[in-house]
Amino acid sequence: MPSALDLRLEAAYNLITGPGGPIQLGSVERFGHQLPFISNAPTNLADYVAFFAAQHGDATFLVEGDERLSFKQVYMAARQVAAGLVEGHGVQRGDRVGLAMRNANAWCVSYIGILMAGGCATLLNGWWQGGELAAGILDSEAKLVIADVQRAARLEGVEHGAKIVTLDLTQPIDLAVAPITGSSRDPARSAPPPCCRR
């Protein structure tokens, strides 16, 4: 027989996971089995970033040296990267876009931007040398590679078939991703999306 505590815990669980709860559970059939899932959760990583930008707007999300980026700043920068990839670099749904750089705020923003653009982020090992990077690019069929200065230099003179966009990671995020987004400040791209307006 359940104790009073068991009953209270079950009631709390049902409030949280039941209809209208913050973690509403549903089920989905996969491979002949019914599996539980959170039915009101964002469906992909780009939607998660939008969700957390709306929830935590100005709270710090990424830190690199002296640069601190809020959830809102990361989301807006990633939207600009996505627009730049589509409009400026012709990225279409399913295109593989390589990422060859060290850990940095611009890596995270570029990764999210690739996903928002519909691309498939192809992560290339930052320790690889030119031939290894080229092999990874060729094997993945990446049409575009976003690289930091050091990784881009390793690819010079090595055949790989991709367009390389070089980012200067010593710059603040807006300037670091400018080779992707373009130098113009399109107000439509800079305006906060509905999730981030307060």
What are these language model-derived features?
Residues 97, 114, 145, 198:
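Conserved S/T- and glycine-rich ATP-binding loop of Class I adenylate-forming
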Residues 57, 179-198:
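Conserved pre-ATP/AMP-binding loop-to-beta segment of ANL
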Residues 37-41, 50, 58-112, 129-134, ...:
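Conserved AMP-binding/adenylate-forming core of the ANL superfamily
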Residues 32-35, 123:
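Structured catalytic cores of enzymes that bind and process phosphorylated ligands/cofactors
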Residues 1-15, 116-183, 187:
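Structural core segment of the AMP-binding/adenylate-forming
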Residues 45, 71-74, 130, 175, ...:
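Structural motif detector for alpha-helix initiation sites
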Residues 20-30, 47-70, 195-197:
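AMP-dependent adenylate-forming
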